[in-house]
Regions:
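Acidic, glycine/proline-rich low-complexity segments that act as flexible tails and inter-domain linkers
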Residues: 1-58, 112-131
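Short C-terminal domain-edge/linker segments immediately following a structured domain
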Residues: 94-95, 99, 128
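Mid-chain, well-packed structural core segment of small domains
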Residues: 62-65, 69-95
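Short alpha-helical scaffolding segments that buttress acidic/His motifs in well-ordered protein cores
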Residues: 41-45, 62-69, 97-102
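Short amphipathic alpha-helical surface patches that mediate protein-protein
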Residues: 82-85, 99-102, 118
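C-terminal structural segments of small proteins and small subunits
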Residues: 105-110
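Residues at alpha-helix boundaries and the short loops/turns that link adjacent helices
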Residues: 17-20, 74, 88, 104
Length: 131
């Protein structure tokens, strides 16, 4: 099946933010059943929402960090920390977003988010490893 223009635009945005290696690995590990989900995510989240002109990718990345903290999704948050760095969000900005979200979402959600972000930042080599 030929992919739609929305899918292609979304795929490019997704690769730009999350990294081609991560995105391509997800798609390669997808069977026909799960491809329905991949299409929804790629076309609507990335091809539509992430590709709209109203907000830049850095701002969208910052919003995602706060939203994923509020939802209590540290597994996804770690992935989006890498994306935030790719869109120009600094380590200090990530920390401030998580502090602000902790105040409104509660300390359990904040703690999960800080841990996930810390692991992701260590993995990206932008924080020194504790000795």
């Amino acid at each position: 099946m030929a992919e739609s223009e929305l899918f292609e635009r979304g795929l490019q945005a997704r690769r730009d933010v999350l990294g081609a290696e991560y995105v391509d690995a997800n798609l390669a590990d997808t069977d026909e059943f799960m491809m329905a989900f991949q299409r929804v995510v790629t076309e609507w989240a990335w091809g539509y929402a992430w590709s709209r002109p109203g907000l830049d990718r850095k701002t969208r990345s910052m919003l995602n960090l706060a939203i994923l903290t509020a939802l209590g999704r540290p597994d996804e948050l770690g992935i989006y920390v890498k994306g935030a760095l790719a869109t120009g969000v600094s380590v200090d900005e990530i920390k401030e977003i998580l502090i602000h979200a902790t105040v409104y979402c509660g300390t359990p959600a904040g703690r999960q988010a800080f841990r996930a972000a810390h692991e992701a930042l260590l993995a990206e080599g932008v924080l020194p490893r504790p000795s």
